[in-house]
Amino acid sequence: MVRFMYALRKRRLSLLLAMSLLVMCVASVVSPPPQALASGSGGIERVFTDKARYNPGDAVSIRVQAKNGTGSSWSGAARLEIFHLENSVYTSSQSLSLTNGQSTTLTFTWTAPSTDFRGYFVRIDAGTLGQGATAIDVSSDFTKYPRYGYISEFESGETALESKAKVDQLAQDYHINAWQFYDWMWRHDKMIKRTGGSIDSTWLDLFNREISWSTLQNQIDAVHDVNGKAMAYAMIYASRENYSPLGISPTWGIYEDSSHTNQFDVDFGDGSTYLYMSDPQNPNWQNYIHAEYIDSINTAGFDGIHVDQMGQRSNVYDYNGNSIDLSTRFSPFLDQAKSVLSANNPARDNLTYNIVDGTVNGWAVNDVSKNADLDFLYSEIWYLSDSYNQLKNYIEQLRANGGNKAVVLAAYMNYADNAGTRYEAESASMTNVSTNTNHAGYTGSGFVDQFASTGDKVSFAINAPEAGDYSLVFRYGNNTGANSTLNLYVDGNFVQKLYFFNQSSWGTWKHDAWYQVPLTQGAHTVELRYESGNVGAVNLDSLTLGTFDEHSVRLADAMMSASGATHIELGDDNQMLPHEYYPNRSKTMRSSLKNAMKDHYNFITAYENLLFDSDVVPNDTGSQFVNLTGVSASGDGSANTVWYINKRTSDYNIVHLINLLGNDNQWRNTASQPSFQTNLPAKIYIGADETISDVYLASPDLSGGETQELAFTSGTDAGGKYVSFTVPELKYWNMIYMKRTFSVPANDIYEAETAIKSNVSTNTNHAGYTGSGFVDGFSSTNDGVSFVVKSTASDDYALRFRYANGGSDATRDVYVDGKLAGTVSFKSTGSWSTWSYGEITARLEPGHHTIVLWQTSGNTGAINLDHLDLDKTYIWQFDRQIVSVPAGYRITFRTGLPGWVHWGVNGWTGVTDTPLRSNGSLDGNLDHETSIGPFATGTAVDVTFLWDDNNNGILEPSTDRWEGTDFGINVS
């Protein structure tokens, strides 16, 4: 993780922040809370597996913890059933007899199938005793479906059994299969501390936290015991202060000036602690730090490296004064790191890298996600992708750039919110202090003033609704010019000295003074006392029991998973991550959220193939595809709507429904419980060549995640072909998946009259059309035709729209899977019975795609649309002059000028002039295109260009400018 958000934007960190993090390190040492029950009901208290992930053919142990609380003896059977999606693949049953109050654990064993990379849902049904569920991931490589957690505490005194317990809890309850070991190292530039060649038993990290080597080893062993992977946190360019004795040279550094006076650094404000930055592309730095990576793997037993950075830096110079673009220097470093790690041990060469402040086309995003040799993509989200839809679009860009590599997001929930039950200081019991209202921004009716002398005290009477960890968060003001301290007592016992940091004014309120404590259920007393040794003064506004908001977490996790990403959020001691500094525990989960997370992680594990596989294609989310009766719906995550996300795989159509009713469009902030829906009518429009055989619903919120089959009807109306069904219940997130077959039309010609139609009609009153007719009335804003097509290969495709235009020239925008591909020109054909083609080229991966031809407010004219012809093509450009194409492919020419492709075959026979049309590209060198072909094997295509410099659209061979060079393309 980026060490602190502030470090992204500033060179120096204040002493205030550095000290606050030191306090947090101390404060986070607490006993673990009682374990949350896994997905189960009634007497089935917990269902779990013994591993986080299984290799094909492994023995899978499924354990069921049951307790009879019925009030009398119970006898019956516990039935196990395992599903892959909607299909049952295994059943087993065990007899069970329990007296009232008796507990037992059943163990079922199943052999994982030989098919790699599949998720399975596990159901336990014990009739009147209860039901339960878990999930199984059969994958030989965790990077296909990384469910990433973290460990951040490595203190002495933690036994091997305690290390195993904290890892087992995350593996069993949440299927976490990889752990980021955060800030485990001694120094960022010398990770393992040695004395006289021997590894020290303990060392202190950057913030003086104790790191125990034996604890670290025990935790790594525990991760391996559950078939998980341990990833060592490291920086891409950071060295601590006094780095020269380690052999690191300032000549490797990056600087703020061309005279190498100021090396980029992070100053922690205590006058002695710094992180200095080296050039990631400097080979000497690479050799040095990559050796540290290898030492971490070979000596500590890590399985890979999690590489971090500090975010955007501009105006960067190397030691020699050369200006460098830092954003382009990460990929070469990472490629070399991967090569070095693989050469050292290919079984322990996993590598990922933090793309900081991720957003569509953000800093370093495209270079790293497209080019770096990473096993999965990882990105920390700050404030450039605040809305649900922005983050969805970013996830889709990462997956597209990375060839569908897995994506993990570090997205800190409720980050700026002081969420949880609040107790106002002015309503607490006070000793020797007063209340006031003379500084704006307080909550409640005022705040406690004059908290500045020995004997001053504020005592809160609080209620813990359940046993567990509680984060005590104090909101305060301090403008004394220095940091202040108070002592914290819980139930009369001294707990910790807390720091309250100096702010710019008394009207600046902060809630960064916190401490986490274990509490029993019921009443407790929390006191702040000013005692001997305390300093300064504070205004105290409130105490909050810092708590994650369940509604926002469930909605955000639904959005990320439905968009194709997982979320690093769960860590040691069953904690959730509130902050970029992982030991921060200023918020906690209550049991209801823990149970919801168990259901969520069961769900994303069981249905990983429909959520994260490479054949899951994001489709267009326009309103023409989904019709929900009785609620506001949107395809872009608009506030107060049911948000639908459409996808397709090779076998299924998928519609995710995320319930934002009653909430805004921001994922990070606290939310309200959405308005739950029952019996929601849905009509889903599909392609003319698709046939739906079954409709299923699965949700982490319903029946423990088990699939249920829905009754449906099929039909056709003015909008096109559809299936309709009733959604029985929608809480936070439903996934509708529909079993589908697809019949590719002859010659890949998709007829417009049978496609999905928006505000247009069909007709047959002009001859020359193909199929049964054509689309008419395509002439107004928000008119459109939407096709569902199948591509068989990763290739460029010419999207050729056959049309007639008896009026003025027209344009239409083309969207491929919801992303603007360009603008097609539909020149006048002179008659409504004269048909021609307008076209644009797009890259398609194998799978099922939506192609939408739409009239936006920026488009003009009217057309009749006959069909879409989907043809594979090779692209010729002046900066990429291809000389051969396969038989059966078209050739697309992209240029920066209007004119004609003047071409013939086999020595200029059959000469033809094909016009180049504007495609709407923002690249002035590629904003015109056309295609020719396809051609048979052995054909030699001869090509040159005639440029329409006067832009009158009239072919004038004696007037227009010839290119003057002939180009040849062979067909093989």
Swiss-Prot record:
Any one Pfam family match given in the protein's UniProt record, by short name: CBM_35
EC primary class: transferase
Catalytic activity from the UniProt record: cyclizes part of a (1->6)-alpha-D-glucan chain by formation of a (1->6)-alpha-D-glucosidic bond
Described function: Produces cycloisomaltooligosaccharide from dextran containing 7, 8 or 9 glucose units. The enzyme is specific for (1->6)-alpha-D-glucans (dextrans) and, without activity toward (1->4)-alpha-D-glucans, such as amylose. It also has no activity on oligosaccharides, such as amylopectin and pullulan, containing (1->6)-alpha-D-glucosidic linkages at branch points.
Region forming the signal peptide: 1-38
SUPFAM superfamilies documented for this protein: Galactose-binding domain-like
Name the UniProt record assigns to this protein: Cycloisomaltooligosaccharide glucanotransferase
EC identifiers of the protein: 2.4.1.248
Organism: Niallia circulans
Keywords: Glycosyltransferase, Repeat, Signal, Transferase
